[in-house]
UniProtKB/Swiss-Prot annotation:
Substrate binds at residues 23, 135, 352. This is 8-amino-7-oxononanoate synthase. Pyridoxal 5'-phosphate binds at residues 110-111, 181, 209, 235. It catalyses: 6-carboxyhexanoyl-[ACP] + L-alanine + H(+) = (8S)-8-amino-7-oxononanoate + holo-[ACP] + CO2. The gene is bioF. It comes from Sodalis glossinidius (strain morsitans).
Amino acid sequence: MADGWMARIDDALAQRRREQTYRERWALSGGNDRLIRDGDRQYLNFSSNDYLGLARHPEVIAAWQQGAAQAGVGAGGSGHVTGYGLHHQRLEQRLADWLGFPRALLFTSGFAANQALVGALTASGDHILADRLSHASLLEAAMHSPATLRRFAHNDADALQRLLRRDCAGNRLVITEGVFSMDGDRAPLPALAEITRAAGCWLMVDDAHGIGVVGEEGRGCAWAPAGRPDLLVVTFGKAVGVSGAAVLCATPVAEYLLQFARHLIYSTAPPPAQIAAIDAALTVVRRGDALRQRLWDNIVRFRRGAAALGFALAPSDTAIQPLVIGDNLRTLQLAQRLRERGVWLTAIRPPTVPPGSARLRITLTSAHLADDIDTLLEALSDAQLQNA
């Protein structure tokens, strides 16, 4: 029987290799920085989610160090035991006030927050209606829940409305992202919010890639009242530059999650030092108009240059600028050609993206210089010609 386990593992790994979808990791230095090192070779980094460059911001680093000195490096337990402290309480209140919700609850990661929220709220007879391109954490949570999952065409409010007319029984939860992690486009939140309110169902938005970057003071995609969801998930590992996540919701929902969200109840709380760093990073985010403007300038420079070179980019006005290649092997080869030219880009392939849509996921940050963008464009042009 033991051999059956290894046979299953060997078959799965062999299939990934055949399909050119085998994932690898590199032990890199400076993965959150503008420049990255692999061994003795240095590259321009265009794969980081640290959109505002806060992972190395001196105020954020100092806050982490001070938090560790004052409160230690671990929380010591679940938030339901001894792990929830004044740092956590203060950050939750600050988030709720800033984003316009009655309550906020901290989680160890965005994946955990999404899984906990969907798993705790849904029951048999409910319906989940999710954008087809929603993040794996959302779709997996929906598939593992007792609810019936239906997917609607990407960013298609009319398709959602048709599904809502068809699926009338039980509670209904509509799920989408603010900024889509692999495509960089934004959900039409005002239209989705209007439809869900009219239908009497709830809207859940994962704004991992919008918070800090989009909206007034970086409040994200859902900051305007017209697009306000019932449930908002924000994460701190992208533009905020740290890690962790929070769920924003009504007070009864927060109390319910404290009773029934197993990912929250049975996980050690985030370290106080991490919470202090997030708090400091949010201060930088709120006054970070100059950082957001620098990021926007880089986005405009890249898109104009790419258009001049004839590249067909996705309709994204965010830090995520995917260049869809299609074929898995060709995408891997193009990524390798770029590394030979000193540019680090990751080849994203199925199952992360749909079959036939393998891509280079180009991410721009406020730390990039204009010369960096020009180097990227030149390298893309040269590598594309060689890879044709």
